[in-house]
């Protein structure tokens, strides 16, 4: 069993189905583990009405998804809502892509 297959087995048991979009075009669907990031600094940003909390999530998505960094607005849709991809990195074991690690930020509805 490869590392990617082992990750996919964990994601199929504990993860959820997501849809990956870039610039309004659906690129694929797959499984991912999504976990909130609570202890990260900088989750509050100033607005005209005071401080606003940015909800950030750690996403570990299956290797089959085309999540590589690219120009444009990349979104992940899941049952909890819509998230914008802030940062994405490959997690590899040797030359094998095991999964994608991404930091997501919740999108505000209507923007």
What are the language-model segments listed below?
Residues 1-26:
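Active-site-proximal polar cores
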Residues 22-111:
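Short, conserved turn/kink motifs that form compact alpha/beta structural patches or helix kinks used as
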């Amino acid at each position: 069993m490869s590392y990617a297959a082992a990750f996919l087995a964990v994601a199929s048991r504990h993860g959820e189905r997501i849809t990956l979009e870039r610039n309004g075009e659906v690129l694929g669907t797959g499984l991912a583990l999504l976990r909130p990031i609570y202890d990260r600094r900088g989750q509050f940003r100033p607005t005209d009405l005071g401080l606003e909390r940015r909800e950030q999530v750690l996403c570990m998505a299956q290797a089959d998804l085309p999540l590589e960094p690219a120009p444009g607005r990349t979104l992940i849709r899941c049952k909890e809502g819509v998230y914008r991809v802030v940062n994405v990195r490959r997690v590899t074991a040797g030359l094998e892509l095991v999964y994608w690690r991404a930091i997501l930020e919740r999108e505000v509805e209507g923007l």
